[in-house]
Regions:
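Rhodanese-like catalytic fold shared by cysteine-dependent sulfurtransferases
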Residues: 2-9, 19-38, 43, 50, ...
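Residue-level signal for mature regions of secreted extracellular proteins and peptides
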Residues: 14-17
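Structural scaffold elements adjacent to functional motifs in cytosolic proteins
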Residues: 52-54
Length: 132
């Protein structure tokens, strides 16, 4: 009788442990990295192959934006990202006015499969060159 119980226990563990481990993993849930304005500025100064996304409205963008920034309002990210941002591994820096919309945009980019997204808050928080 003891041998049957051992065999049953071994079979049970053999089939249940792999499923238990899968349930404990994070599933590879990707996320964006939140960085400071100073860190973003340093990346802009030292890197060349990056894209800057301005997640504000057209009117805000026209009032002044960071050089090289592409306007994609946060509510249009899902519709426009794949067409305008074909390289999902490229460094993407995201900002808005105060940081709320840039977080939403960064989260959406990650959901779409972008792997190198850094959100640096609002344009009002840093000392960036502004162009019109």
């Amino acid at each position: 009788m003891l041998k049957i119980n051992k065999r049953f226990l071994i079979a049970l563990l053999t089939f249940t442990l792999p499923f238990g481990c899968v349930g404990c993993s994070d599933g590879g849930s990707a996320t964006y990295e939140q960085i400071s304005g100073a860190e973003a500025k340093a990346l802009m100064d030292s890197e060349s192959g990056y894209i800057i996304i301005d997640a504000r409205t057209q009117e805000e963008y026209d009032e002044g934006h960071i050089p090289r920034a592409i306007l994609i309002p946060e509510y249009e990210i899902a519709d426009r990202a794949e067409k305008e941002l074909p390289d999902k591994d490229q460094l993407i820096l995201v900002y808005c006015r105060s940081g709320r919309r840039s977080k939403i945009a960064a989260e959406e980019l990650v959901k779409l499969g972008y792997t190198n997204v850094k959100e640096f808050g609002g344009i009002i928080d840093g000392e960036y060159e502004i162009v019109k």
